[in-house]
Each structure stands twice: as C-alpha cells, then as structure tokens.
C-alpha cells in the first residue's frame, strides 16, 4: 500500500481550510495571525484568544493546553486520528486527491 506524501499535502491544504471545517471563528485576526478559542481543549469562552494560528506558516499553538503543530496535526488531534488516517479523512472532506508516496 502506498504511503501519503505528507509534505505535498501540507503544501496543498492551508490551515485556514482546516479551521473552517472545524467551525472555528476568529476573535481577532490580522493578515497573518488568527486568534480564537482552542478546538483541541474546547475553550469554554467563545471570546477566548488562547489559540493562535500563523496563517503564513500553517502552524498553531494553544497558550493554555500547549497543543501545537501544523494543519494535518490539528485535524488529527481534533478528530482523534493517526496522522495517516487524518490525511486521508481531510482529503475526503475537502474533495482533494491524496498525494501518494511510493518510497519505502
């Protein structure tokens, strides 16, 4: 079974697409920064700004639960999936083809 080309997938999917799928709403936003409630530990307040996302680098960090990573790791963590399963699931949800890696 061929693997997933995670690097190519990270280049194809923006973290903003993942935030949209998760139903996340920004409390504050400028051109490259997005802040709002954390979808990982599910912030109690809708006005929370503990979850910080760099839209340019596709990286996130929660200042409360310390969760951090890229767009694929965010999907995996919030959906409680392995990275491989998260990649497949995310591609299906976004209607994208899974980039395959044939390296063993």
Model-derived features: positions:
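N-terminal structured subdomain of primase-like DNA metabolism proteins
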Residues: 1-104
């Amino acid at each position: 079974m061929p693997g997933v080309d995670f690097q190519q997938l990270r280049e194809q999917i923006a973290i903003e697409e993942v935030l949209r799928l998760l139903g996340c709403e920004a409390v504050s936003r400028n051109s490259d920064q997005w802040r709002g409630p954390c979808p990982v530990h599910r912030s109690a307040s809708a006005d929370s700004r503990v979850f910080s996302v760099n839209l340019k680098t596709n990286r996130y960090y929660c200042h409360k639960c310390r969760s951090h990573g890229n767009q694929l790791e965010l999907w995996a963590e919030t959906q409680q999936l392995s990275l491989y399963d998260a990649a497949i699931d995310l591609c299906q949800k976004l209607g994208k083809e899974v980039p395959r890696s044939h390296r063993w």
